[in-house]
Structure formats: structure tokens, C-alpha cells
Regions:
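Structural/interface elements that position substrates and couple domains in central-metabolism enzymes
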Residues: 1-193
């Protein structure tokens, strides 16, 4: 599997075809998709500008990676911290105000690039940790690795992961590709290859 921006690109093509955009009250678009750090700069912003619109003036654009956890009722859109980053400070400020109506904690990223890569890195961490748990289980077949990892997880700075038949939904295996896609020095990320 490889990451694709095809659907995101198609949505923005449709948005840009809408010609009645008010320059007095420019629309705000918050992208929640899993992204590489450079997809807005390399693909989406040029597409918007090719259609005669100026990002930050005619259209406000930012990123707020989705965070949800369906297995725990205490982890909701309201309680999970949201990361936001706009293409300029004004957009970020607006995103904080809008998402602050719903979310208890809104965290400002330096900009849209920093916000964009958050979800990919979160998911890549998760994949590495679960893969390691699975490998430990195979490497030590005579040890109850679930039990050992539960004990390991009692240390304050180590997460608790358990061996399983997989590593998560469709997005988890894609995460390393998103991280690598935007990296200038891909060879430095040998764990993700």
C-alpha cells in the first residue's frame, strides 16, 4: 500500500470550481486527513493558486489531524487534545477559536506543515511499537510475552503493547510511507523502511 492524495486533490478541485467565494469572508477549510508534511505546499496550495485564489486571503487553509479512539468512551472529540496549524497565524487563531468550541484542549503547531505530519508520526510510532511486540512474541515462544509486556508497561515511560494478529486499521501501515514521503533525508529513517 502507498499513501494517496488523490481524494484530497479531487475535493480541492471541486472547491476551487466554486466561483462565488467571498473575499470579505473567505471560507475556512480544515483538513483532518492523514498527510505528509509537504502535501499542502506541493499539491494543494498550487492547485488553489492555479485557480486564481490566494491562500490566506481568498481561502483560509489549515490542518487539524483527526484523533479518535473508538474503544474508550472517555476519549472523545471533546476530551482528546487537538493539534492545529494554519498556513498563517490568522488562520491558526481562527482554527483555535472554532475547534475550541468543541475540544477542551487545542494545541498550536508552528504551521500547517508541523500539524500535517503529527498524525503520520503518531501512527508510525504505534506501528513500530506493535510490530516490536509481535516480533518479541515470535522470538520468545516459550515466554508469555503478553505478561512480560504488561509488566514492562508499568514503567512510567514505556507504553503497553501486546502481540496481536495485526497492527491496526488501514491507516497504521500507511503511516511510515507518509512520514518518508515528506522527509528530506529518508535514509535517516531506516526504522520505517
Amino acid at each position: 500500500q502507498k499513501p494517496t492524495s488523490e481524494y484530497l486533490e479531487e475535493v480541492f478541485k471541486q472547491l476551487c470550481s466554486y466561483k462565488e467565494i467571498s473575499r470579505d469572508q473567505p471560507p475556512s477549510i480544515i483538513v483532518e486527513s492523514t498527510l505528509s508534511a509537504n502535501v499542502l505546499d506541493d499539491l494543494i496550495i498550487p492547485l488553489i493558486e492555479k485557480n486564481g485564489l490566494k491562500v490566506g486571503k481568498d481561502l483560509l487553509l489549515g490542518v487539524a489531524p483527526r484523533r479518535d479512539w473508538f474503544v474508550d468512551a472517555d476519549k472523545t472529540l471533546k476530551t482528546l487534545p487537538r493539534v492545529v496549524g494554519g498556513t498563517n497565524k490568522e488562520t491558526t487563531d481562527l482554527m483555535v477559536d472554532v475547534l475550541g468550541l468543541i475540544c477542551d484542549t487545542v494545541l498550536r503547531a508552528n504551521d500547517h506543515k508541523h500539524a500535517a505530519i503529527v498524525k503520520s508520526i503518531e501512527n508510525a510510532y504505534r506501528q513500530l511499537e506493535i510490530t516490536f511486540a509481535n516480533q518479541l512474541s515470535v522470538a520468545y515462544p516459550n515466554i508469555d510475552m503478553k505478561h512480560v509486556l504488561k509488566l514492562v508497561g508499568t514503567k512510567w515511560n514505556v507504553g503497553t503493547y501486546h502481540p496481536s494478529f495485526g497492527i491496526g486499521g488501514y491507516c497504521i501501515p500507511l503511516a511510515p510511507h507518509y512520514v518518508l514521503e515528506g522527509a528530506k533525508n529518508k535514509e535517516a529513517l531506516s526504522l520505517l523502511k
